[in-house]
């Protein structure tokens, strides 16, 4: 992935800092975790991938981050700790991807927990050639997420029929790409396709946005001097 992800994380975190007042909570994502998530999302194209996480209980958020972004006004499972290791839960289309296979579910509670009846606190799924904006299926699945629900939009070309990219202006957009003058840069290549950019958002099951930060292993946001 080269150095573009470091540049993208720096730009993303600066935006997170500038917009910190619009969010009631924040979540720290280690850079290498983000790198893995991006790789899995690219490798799964044209399908979506569902990834599960638990918080890392050995990595509380650094005090400097809490001071800069303020104490969270909304609580969620894993709040106050870095995001833990990623695990691929499922790969499929926009509806089937939200089904959690039996090996990841807690049988005693799966019926009560609905579509997300698994042991993971937080989830991320990819949107191939689509904005990072929750669909109706996404919103219904998020009703059972106790932590943070995240979406990674992936823009690529050439696109299979039915997965063409359409520009839209509505909604809150959070780009994850380097600050370059190129309108359509090529960040990576996979299976004969060019990957041009990403979007990344997080939200709680009540629809409230979560401010995401990409960090060092210790939890310090890349590119921010706190």
Where do the protein language model's features map onto the residues?
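Conserved beta-strand-loop surface patch within small alpha/beta domains used
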Residues: 1-122, 128-226
């Amino acid at each position: 992935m080269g150095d573009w992800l470091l540049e993208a994380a720096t730009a993303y975190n600066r935006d997170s800092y500038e917009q910190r007042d619009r969010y009631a909570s924040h979540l720290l994502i280690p850079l290498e975790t983000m790198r893995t998530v991006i790789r899995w999302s690219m490798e799964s194209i044209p399908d979506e991938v569902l990834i599960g996480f638990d918080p890392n209980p050995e990595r509380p958020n650094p005090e400097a981050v809490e001071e800069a972004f303020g104490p969270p006004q909304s609580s969620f499972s894993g709040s106050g700790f870095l995001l833990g290791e990623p695990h691929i839960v499922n790969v499929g289309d926009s509806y089937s991807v939200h089904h959690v296979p039996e090996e990841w579910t807690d049988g005693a509670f799966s019926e009560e927990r609905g579509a997300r009846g698994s042991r993971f606190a937080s989830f991320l799924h990819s949107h191939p050639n689509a904005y990072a904006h929750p669909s109706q299926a996404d919103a219904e699945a998020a009703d059972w997420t106790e932590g943070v629900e995240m979406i990674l939009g992936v823009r690529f070309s050439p696109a299979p029929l039915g997965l063409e990219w359409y520009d839209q202006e509505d909604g809150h957009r959070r780009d994850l790409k380097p600050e370059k003058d190129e309108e359509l840069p090529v960040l990576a290549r996979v299976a004969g396709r060019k990957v041009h950019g990403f979007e990344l958002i997080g939200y709680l099951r009540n629809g409230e946005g979560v401010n995401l930060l990409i960090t060092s292993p210790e939890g310090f946001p890349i590119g921010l001097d706190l």
